[in-house]
Regions:
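Polar low-complexity intrinsically disordered regions
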Residues: 1, 16-22, 58
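Bacterial N-terminal signal peptides that target proteins for export
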Residues: 1-7
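HKD-type phospholipase D/PLD-like phosphodiesterase module
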Residues: 20-48, 66-67, 71-180
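Short catalytic-loop micro-motif centered on adjacent basic/acidic residues
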Residues: 53-57, 81-83
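Secreted/periplasmic proteins that engage bacterial cell-wall peptidoglycan
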Residues: 58-61, 65-68
Length: 180
């Protein structure tokens, strides 16, 4: 990446990239927080969802994003959420109880089973969503207020990303079906 391209990426909170020399229609957008307020882009995608929203994020404390998922469920969209078990148990702002109250299917997961130090297993540290089998949101961005206003984070939005969305959907379903 040239210095000019890197400078442009740092100055503009949402950058759209299109594949060059390809018939592919996939559009990639990048958002950087805290200046980019990535939650606004996530909210837009949730609000436009028609059939399915699959969300796997380590930390979920953002009230607006949680409410948008509840509204999507009320519109008839299938919504499923996977969050990290330890984060949810140790953070009073985590939205696990909210999702249960809204009857949104929820899994509290740990990471893959492996011995790490003095504990078994790691973290469920994924940060992605698949929307209507054609949109993928992924990056370092946890769905928290801190991610929007304090932390240096990134979010990639892939639209019209059928094959990529299917890979992420498979990864989500593997998490969902893993024994607790």
């Amino acid at each position: 990446m040239t210095r000019a391209a890197l400078a442009a990426a740092m100055l503009f909170p949402l950058i759209t990239l299109r594949p060059v020399g390809s018939a592919a229609e996939m559009v990639v957008q990048a958002c950087f927080s805290p200046q980019g307020k990535c939650s606004a882009h996530i909210l837009r995608e949730i609000d436009q969802a028609k059939k399915e929203l699959l969300v796997a994020v380590y930390a979920f404390t953002n009230d607006d994003l949680a409410s948008a998922l509840a509204q999507a469920k009320k519109r008839g969209v299938t919504v499923q959420v996977v969050i990290d078990r330890e984060f949810d148990a140790g953070n009073e702002k985590s939205k696990g109880k909210f999702f249960e109250a809204q009857k949104i299917p929820l899994r509290r997961m740990t990471g893959a089973k492996s011995k790490t130090g003095d504990r078994d297993g790691g973290l469920m540290h994924q940060k992605f969503a698949v929307i209507d089998r054609r949109i993928v949101l992924t990056g370092s961005y946890n769905w928290t207020h801190a991610a929007d206003s304090l932390n240096d984070e990134n979010l990639l939005l892939f639209r019209d990303a059928g094959p990529l969305a299917e890979e992420y959907r498979k990864a989500f379903l593997q998490l969902w079906e893993r024994k607790l």
